[in-house]
């Protein structure tokens, strides 16, 4: 019985340490993450998405542009995956459109070989920055790779 209790205490301690370390690691990633968001000066939902990211611990700088096409072209964001704004991390990853902060955090905390960014194509209702009452349109968060593929 004594060995079982000892084993149980060690298991509980180890599990709580691992979970705690993961949470601290995720929080550190957010606190260190700076995004530059490229948007047009008149877009209201872009500002709401920036607020969503800041509310979730990201440091965000915005840059207004009359046209975003060259920026999106340089980042290799295909037209069918584009939205109204583009966030770019310090590491050069893009976050196109209304990507929820939790997916940005997950992407940045995991190893994604050959990945170049995430996107939420279009402007789906219910996504961060596109909240309208309780309306919701299901949407996909896509991961993009250097070879032009996505999933």
Give the location of each predicted region:
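Short active-site oxyanion
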Residues: 34-35, 58-60, 91-94
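N-terminal secretory signal peptides that target proteins for export/translocation
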Residues: 1-5
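Local sequence-structure signature of Cys/Sec-based thiol-disulfide redox active-site neighborhoods
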Residues: 28-56
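Thiol/selenol-based redox catalytic cores and closely related redox-interacting motifs
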Residues: 74, 80-151
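N-terminal, post-signal-peptide region of Sec/Tat-exported proteins
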Residues: 47-89
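Boundary at the C-terminal end of the N-terminal hydrophobic targeting segment
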Residues: 24-26
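Stable alpha-helical elements in mature extracytoplasmic
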Residues: 42, 49, 64-67, 100-104
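Bacterial N-terminal signal peptides
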Residues: 9-20
